[in-house]
């Protein structure tokens, strides 16, 4: 007689609860948590879909859900036990936005989970709040802009009030609304074909043969937006290094730097290696790329990705890029500084960032970015190119950093560039707007170190 030792597979709702707890209470990242869960449990396709829908859905609607809980609860939302708050959000999201799910299933499953993760008093509270919602569900109307503009926008766009206030003041209400709306769209999968293993034209044909609908990205010869059949990429294509999942905007800095075969290149803040491997592929695996990052485990990830993609020109090492390294002064033809930043351009797929950042946090980044750019400038050869990029839309981390740098460094000049579908740079600087690019928000600046005359 044989006995199965297979671990029981929890329901999608139970796993969604755990994922949300890790993200909201332990500062984990949603994409990493979901990857771990999917690697651990053999879920059916419909369970995977429900799990991801619940996790990302709750994070996208978090403000709205907490507001409703506040209307229903006799206790202040902030004082509720985290397990209670998360279970209520999980249930209310299903009741409000997933109409195909029966109300009884959403409520009963949450009560069942509550019995496993908290004490009987909290179980009764969860059950009571949800039953109360079902009685009053048609009475929860978001205030109009005329009644309370800031609350209306915070609940409609599910962004923190301080960010709505800051961006509406900076860009005007219409532009800010368009950006916030874009952040709440579910992002399409975009991939970069590895030309070292398969030319882009051949890969497009392969996609078509497998019934995968894909559209080329106009400004990226090796880039494709996957319209349908994305599940194929979590098999052969990625494991064999034929393609790499990367946002379209994230591919732009390397495109603008435009490294050539035989050149020496530095990627100063390289992990996880997406731009590093992209540059190596652009160089045809000829030349040399030094890839730095602060943490050894991230260096291991760069090496792993390079090996999988068949790249031999990347030399990755742990370095504190804020510390001077005279040995490599004016060594490189091209330098990419994709600087650490507030991440306020990637709120569509790193949804939780909006709930973690504060206005005060934004003050931490410019001093670091300025220090890194000062070091980057030393490593570029005369006549060489330096690209500075971030994945934020905060001008103090973008235009202000580059403008101040150019004022202090007359040996550098901005170089204008143009990309199909994204427009032209101004004074060597380009902001990629998520509402226009249907991708992440990014900032890219291209500078040249003048040759001595």
Where are these regions (language model features)?
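S-adenosylmethionine
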Residues: 1-453
